[in-house]
């Protein structure tokens, strides 16, 4: 198609799609990003970038809710759409910390477990058997706003279409619409490939409901990527896909979204502008030398991009990032690099988060030295900001701008005050007043919202002091954000009437227990409190007797006690919230010893049981059979029913810890223990090196002999290796 006719067609499609919408607003960008040989250009200026990869600007995996049990994959999560304020905040955080471009994750594809998990997706099944997939309008309006915010704030976007994997639904789920297989996605005569091309057409020709522009006219869209980690990309697949994208989006760039290699056929394809690679340890390419190796393979024929790398210590990430910044082969350099991965502020306070199988957490901007210390968060954020500055010709990163005002959320309680943090705020001060205009008193200083594993069901950013408030009075609150560059203007003001009167803790305790002198007794109390005047509740056990009762831990709700003589004992448990307290008493009847008493009623270290002491149950399989390796680890528990069983001893009935020596060398996984034929106790194991590590699992055992099974039970996943177990009590 000739260029002029093509442009006329684009204009006609745009007008038809707008359907009477308001005229398109003017873009905040002057130019589309273009390619000049192996270099990206913004007008006549070289365009390079570094950042932290933000996969979820358009769809959020809400890890705080945990896995969806209705999804048999085990790790299936809950997802939701971000709010417009969240998208604005996240993009602002990136831009204000130096980002110029960002790659997001793919368009999600409907799959069979979505309904049970309440998940919505971007791509819906066709309405007829041989029809084309449909775009979910609700999802695409969120996508519209992401693009509009990126344009408004000056962030270029790389947008991949379909995933090789099934995390969000990918090629396998697309193929399932047509009763084809995942590999048919790469076969250009398949129904799946035809559907893939139609999804591309629908997306690129969509009119943005926020800007009024067709997607192919959005300057914020730097490039379309064929997909995420499409490692089986072949020449025909790429040739047809890239040409199809260029047909509909002639002003935007095309990325070959392959993985682990540079495709030689991509280098000669006239419609491919950028070749990309992802660096990860499991791909054996997560090192600085990969940059030069790939640049040599590209040979200056295309732009080269490191679309993802990460899950390494900060010093190793910095070595790779500095290689991206400085490596040069015959004048060609990498256009950019993105470290995996970012999560942003929640609408109602705190941050979203994600934990990888390696134990690494997502990074929060602008970085939190204390809260993110174990994750080396501040070091990672700083190395990325430094790289972005170097790519812009500067030696050091610019200071952060002063933060904008946070957004204080309405509440009905002065003990549950939350706000959406400022994009680059590091800490916050909370002020209270008796009137909406002040005078204001600071009641909370240097509060951080950068805590990892934030749970909105159980956590709040600020609780006022109960002792300073009067019941029935109305109080007013506002918040200011701070960072090293200054303080924000105050937030909006909210009013709260204090109507919560402190109540004493409610204690639950069995009224009577029976034991013998040689066994001792396990004491288990529970309590509930209203969280007033604070969430701190002191607990303790007492016996007003003659010293014949001994507690292992008198300051814990669950502990053990033993007795120097038979008799009847009244043991009292108390929960004290600081103003009010409650107590309950259990009567323990202690008979004479029926066996030998243990030397220590509180501590126990049993035998270490290796896999040689266990009994194996091996399921028949053509591959990955359960076996003991030369390193002494048993694995990989690849088939449901694979298990190892031990007979272990316990000195008394009650709670113990199981020291498990395991190896998670191939990534995180989920396996289960079964004690004495009970229900499987599921355990999430992190990734380790080949030496393995220990994990402590709480178990309930009976006095004497117990059977402990470990294996792959229903719902378990991943390859696992185990070496030994040991029963302990401390």
Where are each of the predicted segments found?
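Recognizes extended acidic, P/S/T-rich segments that occur
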Residues: 429-470
